[in-house]
Amino acid sequence: MAARPNNIGIKAIELYFPSQCVDQAELEKFDGVSAGKYTIGLGQTRMSFCDDREDIYSLTLTTVSSLLRKYNIDPKSIGRLEVGTETLLDKSKSCKTVLMQLFEPCGNTNIEGVDTVNACYGGTNALFNTLNWMESSAWDGRNAIVVAGDIALYKKGNARPTGGAGCVAMLIGPDAPLVIEPGLRGSFVKHAYDFYKADLTSEYPLVDGQYSIKCYTEAVDKCYEAYNGREKTLKSQANGHSNGVDAAQEAPLDRFDYMCFHAPTCKLVSKSYARLLYNDYLADPTNELFKEVPAELKDLSYEASITDKTVEKTFMGLAKKRFAQRVQPSIQVPTMCGNMYCASVYASLVSLISNVSSADFQGKRVGIFSYGSGLASSLFSLKVKGSTEEITKNLNLQERLDARRVVAPEVYDEMCNLREKAHLQKDFKPKGSVDTILPNTYYLTNVDDMFRREYEVKKE
């Protein structure tokens, strides 16, 4: 058995987003809504999308092959591969099995893991499963890859501008620069019909928008409470020498130097960060930090607090400076690409890595909040214990975002229609152009009369 691993975490990370996007300000005009509804009200700038040439198999194949290539990873060195997605093409065959095409040529078929599904939470569950594997007697000494990706698409209406598409692949192993703090996380899971996909004939979800925001907010509260409780337990077990809140910090929230959130919209992220500060206020209303907070807010019922505009406005104001320093660097991809469902929170981490220099990042703690409707959620954290320079260089984020083709809303609408027509089709050839697809990207060429899908890779 391999020696027990230390400092397990993220050793490398790759992000893929389609080469085309639509401008949200143009979409506002096209949809006939007031200026700023999407750009200010939702906090969204652009939205990634794909036509019928790309699907979840092609997205994950592109992302994992790119991770292997950019970091010169030997496919034989991977002992586990797990995928988190809610974009299902098959009710039986996993996306992970499709990815085995990248490992079979070298003879590596001894790779554990399949898919894990629960709305936008699947990637986090895949990560937790992988950490558990690496800490267990089942670990054989090899690294693992966790994949999180989705195509987020809504029918015409209010929710359509909150779509997006993208995929993240992470190399997980010991002695990582981004170390997941062991044993330190809090989760909240409950039964809720806030967003679900019970209509298997449609690619579109059934959504109760306001209820889903309420569920997300409750999950923020409960995960923070559970994380704090777990931290206290670990601290007491370590005789007060671990995971404590520094006396110099104004509030418990300050123990996170940065935070990443699952980002259905960037506006919800800013509200949720402020909500954590509200939780700190309830725990210690006499703290000097909260001296301007109206006294009556501490006596609100829990239900009322979730939708109370005074609570929201007061704590967004109080959190504004902290948000700019600690969360703003993480929302570059969410605002420029939209919601990637399972990949969303890890795209936030990609943004953070790309926007904070490796030198400034050292020793910092990052809080990560993951949410999936239905619902499952967790708050966990990582510590930066090594250089992130190579990751930043390989991501080349800003240049890649800038290189995308921005299309008119009319074109985006056509692409959505193409996807709608392609859904559940067999004996089918995609209609989308391959000219817009970038080199080294997988794309769909054919679906035969037994629904078997065939792909090609765009050549350099």
Curated annotation (Swiss-Prot):
Keyword annotations: Transferase, Virulence
Function recorded in the entry: Hydroxymethylglutaryl-CoA synthase involved in the biosynthesis of a ferrichrome A-like siderophors which may contribute to organismal virulence. The first step of siderophore biosynthesis is performed by the HMG-CoA synthase (HMGS) MYCGRDRAFT_54740 which catalyzes the generation of HMG-CoA and CoA using acetoacetyl-CoA and acetyl-CoA as substrates. The enoyl-CoA isomerase/hydratase MYCGRDRAFT_76805 then catalyzes the conversion of HMG-CoA to methylglutaconyl-CoA.
Taxonomy, superkingdom: Eukaryota
GO annotation (BP), single: acetyl-CoA metabolic process
Pathway assignment: Siderophore biosynthesis
One example GO MF annotation: hydroxymethylglutaryl-CoA synthase activity
One Pfam entry name: HMG_CoA_synt_N
Keyword Transferase: yes
Record gene name: ERG13
Cystines in this chain: none
Family indicated by similarity: Belongs to the thiolase-like superfamily. HMG-CoA synthase family.
Leading EC class: transferase
Protein name, per record: Hydroxymethylglutaryl-CoA synthase MYCGRDRAFT_54740
Catalytic reactions on record: acetoacetyl-CoA + acetyl-CoA + H2O = (3S)-3-hydroxy-3-methylglutaryl-CoA + CoA + H(+)
Record: residues binding (3S)-3-hydroxy-3-methylglutaryl-CoA: A35, C120, N158, T162, S212, H262, K271, N339, S373
Organism: Zymoseptoria tritici (strain CBS 115943 / IPO323) (Speckled leaf blotch fungus)
